[in-house]
Amino acid sequence: MRYIILLFVLLTACQLPNNSEQDQALTAEEEAIAKELIQGSFDKIWGGVDSNEIVNYHTDDFIILEHGVVWDNDRIKVYIRGQHQRENRPLRKNRMEYISIEKYGASIQMAYHNYAEFVRADTLVGKRQWLESALAVKTEKGWRLKMMHSTRVPN
């Protein structure tokens, strides 16, 4: 009988929830950090056309998968250099609508709609929309984006 009770206790203990970091719910602070990673990366890197900001938002091995193309930090830098050479390029403003933000251990997964407006001299010259997902990971430098997936939504 003692063995049955011991076995029952052991099996019950194995079923208890684990309170490790992996099972911790997303905090309001982490949600704000995740949203700032997305908004800040688009405002400063893509809208601000500043490749120096990549280190503040991306991991070293960051990639974007967009419409069959793989973008890494080096490819983004080349793109930004090209943007600097464009005369009279429009300003880009992005707005996000979040579908979900969930934490898994030391990572945060996000899904959102990304709306961009392109303005030149107070005139709207274009609009784009994407359906995107992103993965942020906790690093020694703080939270950084590790991967994104982007699908263009037809206008």
List each model region and its residues.
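Sec-dependent N-terminal signal peptides
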Residues: 3-12
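Short, low-complexity N-terminal intrinsically disordered segments enriched in polar/charged residues
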Residues: 14-56
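A solvent-exposed, acidic/Ser-Thr-rich amphipathic alpha-helical stretch
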Residues: 51-104, 124
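Short, surface-exposed coil-to-beta transition loops
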Residues: 93-96, 111-113, 126-132
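A short, structured loop/turn motif at beta-sheet edges
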Residues: 101-108, 136-142
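Beta-strand elements of well-folded, non-transmembrane domains
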Residues: 102, 116-120
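A short hydrophobic beta-strand element
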Residues: 106-116
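Short beta-strand edge/turn micro-motifs at domain boundaries
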Residues: 129-155
